[in-house]
């Protein structure tokens, strides 16, 4: 199993109105990158609001293993970085646990160095394909040893001098884009990434913030060209990590579905590459008020007031998928209570997440009485306003497949369903949102 912890099932039951004001743990994407860029930069980086889930902590441990000094004082993480180009060879394999982001980005960061680095992970991460990151690294001259199908364990050895490349990202993947850019940091000359569909852009924004010479151009067709000059100096920064929109999704959708709810969520990252879920829910009729919008560390941030809403089904534009890929499971839960059908297309990326998320969602919905159809890369959900008949009175358990987002999504389903909803394991929620149970029960949710 993922953590060597024995599975701990959890059950969510129909709840009365959810009320309160909450702060969500820091954004996972920005937290991973804060540890990485702080560990690489010259001088001191100070981070508040860091997401202290296992995934991010594993990225921090990897940076420590390559020479960064990391300590915590009160609520602040303080990093003394090694300086760009000065990472040290790790003495042991770098263990990323369940973290696809940390693993793939670090492969880019250190793979081009002229020493061996070995990457390992848990049972779930070991099944996930790494080839999409390894292919461009091979073009830069990196030698790759990997398990069958370019899976972990992977050992990388960079060339004496890496080649700068121009790489067109073949799928909408911020991880692949970021891995190539990070490899470019220790490569002489200009590394260019061409991105046909825009994905989350935290790597570009944060590298510019740390002083990298990086430019972004967008043509009339929306194709982005990112150029990075290698071997420049990065300088330590002060970072306050905004709340993770992917974690915000759970209390937000719960408040929309439980009658009488009125919940305010503070300090949420509103980067336009991450707000597809909020936009979609608003199209479905969700009452989501964006309050106090502001800029923090180059990123858009706001507070959200969310109230119970009667939703109606919509067709989600396929091009929106990259900006909400992690939120489809909880969107499918919202759709289960909407009037009419919600159609979601372009979901092929969901099949290679922590689990095959598409089939995991469809199976869980069916187990709990939701009418849905799973296609090759699509999901259609026909909702039942009020949740009558939804849930599983017999206590049938949703198979989470060690996937934190599946577990949290189905616990939200149970809060508004007529019958309880049980998930087979809730231990792995700690990878991204350790405070989930306490935060939800604090708002009035019944989860046990």
Swiss-Prot record:
One of its GO terms (biological process) is chorismate biosynthetic process. Pathway: Metabolic intermediate biosynthesis; chorismate biosynthesis; chorismate from D-erythrose 4-phosphate and phosphoenolpyruvate: step 6/7. InterPro entries: Enolpyruvate_Tfrase_dom, Enolpyruvate_Tfrase_sf, EPSP_synthase, EPSP_synthase_CS, RNA3'P_cycl/enolpyr_Trfase_a/b. It catalyses: 3-phosphoshikimate + phosphoenolpyruvate = 5-O-(1-carboxyvinyl)-3-phosphoshikimate + phosphate. PROSITE patterns: EPSP_SYNTHASE_1, EPSP_SYNTHASE_2. It comes from the Bacteria. Keywords: Amino-acid biosynthesis, Aromatic amino acid biosynthesis, Cytoplasm, Transferase. One of its GO terms (molecular function) is 3-phosphoshikimate 1-carboxyvinyltransferase activity. One of its GO terms (cellular component) is cytoplasm. 3-phosphoshikimate binds at residues 28-29, 33, 173, 175, 326, 353. Phosphoenolpyruvate binds at residues 28, 100, 128, 175, 357, 405. NCBIfam families: aroA. Belongs to the EPSP synthase family. Catalyzes the transfer of the enolpyruvyl moiety of phosphoenolpyruvate (PEP) to the 5-hydroxyl of shikimate-3-phosphate (S3P) to produce enolpyruvyl shikimate-3-phosphate and inorganic phosphate. This is 3-phosphoshikimate 1-carboxyvinyltransferase.
